Amino acid sequence: MSATISDLDRLLVAIAAIPTPWKEWPGGYPGRLDLALVDAVMSIRFRYGRERKDGSWTGARGAVLRYQAYSDHVAPAEKMKNLANQDPIALERILNRQKVHSGKTKACAIVEAAQRFLAIDVTEPAHLRPDDAEHRAQYTGVSGLGPVTWEYFTMLLSHDGVKADTWIRRFVERSVQRNVSSDEAGALIKEAANKLDVRETKLDYAVWNYASTTRLETMPKLS
């Protein structure tokens, strides 16, 4: 359902206050389905990370780069099969021991998702279709993985979208001055992107970067 005019107008006013030029979306992994999957899962409730003086990275970015180096020797056509065949416990030592919920590590969720995609012959970025219900179900069918990170997974493969995470939702809530769900926040950002004639991914990243760096200190709190 379309947002009300008042909500969309308020959101557009808030977006107009974001300093320009907007921070550019850093891009994802258009040629690496395995890295997109690792990033999507490792980013759940985890900071993106920052570069250390030695060139290594902390956070989710660091985990992805470690796995990239670890799997560098694998032939491109075998990347997803290699990920699906990983021992989750061994993979934890490369990534980290964070969990998607109390009973499952992120490494375990990554391997399970890779196995599910492998079972339906989705092994390369070109095979994945964001609007395919079966493809979505293979991802969200893994306990701990949901629709928000599914959309982020597809964004990392160069498909347009919005990852309606905590910062996106909070920005929208502050803009419209009421509580909203992740689904509603994502829909509003998409409507705003359409109104502004920009890619959804571009607006998503601009809002996320602004919200996460300013902690929304200049925006009015919910009354």
Kindly label every feature range from the protein language model.
Residues 1-31, 35, 105-115, 125-223:
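C-terminal accessory module of base-excision DNA glycosylases/AP lyases that mediates lesion recognition
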Residues 1-100:
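Structure-specific DNA junction-binding interface
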Residues 42-50, 72, 118, 161, ...:
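Short alpha-helix boundary/capping elements
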Residues 67-142:
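Alpha-helical ds-nucleic-acid-binding substructure associated with the helix-hairpin-helix region
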